[in-house]
């Protein structure tokens, strides 16, 4: 089990900087490019802070960090016509992104991301029935996948991007749920390949997308119809608030963890979320458990890199030898076997 860190806004030791659209425009009107200069300085501050957090994770024995959702304020606002490649300080920003990637690989700290536009309460999403919302979502997903590329990471699930289905229905029939999964897939394939190869879906806390439905439609159904094997990310708090039941019996936490873990490629450690003070359940397969921290403090001592056995060379070797096709074929074979012999919900997670 690997401990993963999510920093909350309440953390007094961490202060990421943002910039409102109103303030940006005020600065631009006061002096040409002043708003852009201010924005650039705040992005640079956020990236330096991110690098410091990753170093601190290494010293605290934390092997994973979910990137702060607002590292790049306003860059997703199309009306401002801002571009990462041309913004003031672009070269410094690029170098800092490379530094973050190097620091994470040096200390064997993996990274993930959950875009702010795709939080659980967002009205946007890949399955939206509003094309403008889909365009907005695709733009943001492409941007954050590009950040991982600039950091030097392979385009795979070892640096995952987490989203929710977002589109829900009160009439959770097979037809309606399949329709949402189809729309999600259609939106997803509008993204760059570097998004598709990183995208994972999480169970929701108060919609039709509990663990069971997510597995059946986003993993099994999507794999069978669209030939895309979607990894699923488990959230224990959402599961507790929105449980699954099969034949009148509640599906247990252990069953959900086991099922979701098996949706990930064999050579990638699944990234799940554990949202209470108790320790996550132990599991035969290594799992990264993200957890919010309000009291995370930076150590004063210099971080000592981990041994060479766990640093960049191993990462490179993993990238070169990654062959997802056999795993995909194996899972598809299993899915097709179940589809032929079962009706919806007539089995427990493909068994």
Feature roles, as predicted:
Residues 114:
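Conserved, mostly hydrophobic/aromatic
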Residues 160-177:
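Glycine-rich phosphate-binding "P-loop"
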Residues 168-170, 205-208, 238-241, 279:
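Short, catalytically relevant binding-site loops at active-site mouths
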Residues 233, 240-241, 269:
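Conserved His + Asp/Glu catalytic blocks
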Residues 111, 232-235:
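Residue-level marker for buried hydrophobic side chains located in beta-strands
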Residues 1-110, 119-142, 146-157, 180, ...:
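Alpha/beta catalytic barrel-like cores
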């Amino acid at each position: 089990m690997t401990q993963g860190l999510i920093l909350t806004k309440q953390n007094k030791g961490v202060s990421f900087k943002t910039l409102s659209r109103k303030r940006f425009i005020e600065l631009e009107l006061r002096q040409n490019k002043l708003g852009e200069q201010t924005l650039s300085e705040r992005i640079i501050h956020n990236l330096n802070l991110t690098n410091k957090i990753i170093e601190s994770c290494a010293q605290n024995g934390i092997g994973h960090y979910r990137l702060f959702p607002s590292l790049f304020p306003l860059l997703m606002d199309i009306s401002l016509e801002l571009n990462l490649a041309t913004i003031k300080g672009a070269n410094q920003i690029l170098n800092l992104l490379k530094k973050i990637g190097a620091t994470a690989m040096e200390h064997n700290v993996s990274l993930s991301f959950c875009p702010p536009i795709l939080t659980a309460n967002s009205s946007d999403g890949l399955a939206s029935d509003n094309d403008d919302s889909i365009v907005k979502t695709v733009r943001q997903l492409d941007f954050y996948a590009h950040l991982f590329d600039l950091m030097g990471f392979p385009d795979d699930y070892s640096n995952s991007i987490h989203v929710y289905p977002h589109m829900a229905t009160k009439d959770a029939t097979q037809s309606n749920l399949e329709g949402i999964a189809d729309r999600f897939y259609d939106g997803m394939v509008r993204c760059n390949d570097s998004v598709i190869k990183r995208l994972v879906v999480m169970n929701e806390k108060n919609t039709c997308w509990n663990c069971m439905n997510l597995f059946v439609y986003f993993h099994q159904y999507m794999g069978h119809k669209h030939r895309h094997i979607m990894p699923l990310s488990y959230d224990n708090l959402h599961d507790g608030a929105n449980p699954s039941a099969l034949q009148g019996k509640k599906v247990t936490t252990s069953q959900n963890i086991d099922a979701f873990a098996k949706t990930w490629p064999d050579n990638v450690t699944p990234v799940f979320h554990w949202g209470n003070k108790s320790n996550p359940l132990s599991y035969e397969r290594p799992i990264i458990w993200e957890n919010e921290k309000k009291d995370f403090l930076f150590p004063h001592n210099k971080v000592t890199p981990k041994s060479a056995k766990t640093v960049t060379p191993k990462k490179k070797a993993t990238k070169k030898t990654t062959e997802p096709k056999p795993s995909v074929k194996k899972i598809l074979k299993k899915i097709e076997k179940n589809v032929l012999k079962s009706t919806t919900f007539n089995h427990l997670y493909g068994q």
